[in-house]
Amino acid sequence: PGAVSPMIAAGRVVKELYPDAMTVFVGPCMAKKKEAREEDIADAVDYVLTFQEVQDIFDAAGIQPELLSEDEKEHSSRAGRIYARTGGVSEAVKKTVEQIDPDKKIPVIPEQADGVPACKKLIERIQKGETEANFFEGMACNGGCVGGPKIIIKKEEGKERVDAYGDEAQYRTPLENPF
């Protein structure tokens, strides 16, 4: 089987650890709603909500998240926290592989594409052998998930927040995480 998205992988882990759990993915991506219903992976995520839908629910219920106390997720690594922006997946994979095998004979050489037109061009370059990269990251939305269609803050602010959140992580990669 091929690789699955972080949404599906996380959903499957939760279902494995807590078989009766109901899983809900929240993000800026409309495509995740369709992905979660794909027959071969529909077991992982029960519901998908966009940031805008969650904001609408909060508004209707009178919930003001900024007034709630924070719940620190000290167990997540920087590598996991920066996936949401272009270059985040590449950086996470490169750093983790380097940590697994620092003397690796074939280094990870990433290349990113930001937005659908750039993804198409990257695919064409790969097919023509016009790149030295051996790991490819394609983000359909400009800026990555932080630029998705249902964002509720500007993508530039989203990228800054993702990077800051990554910088706060206790662990650089999942390998350092004892949990």
Language model regions located:
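Iron-sulfur-associated redox domains of electron-transfer enzymes in respiratory
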Residues: 1-179
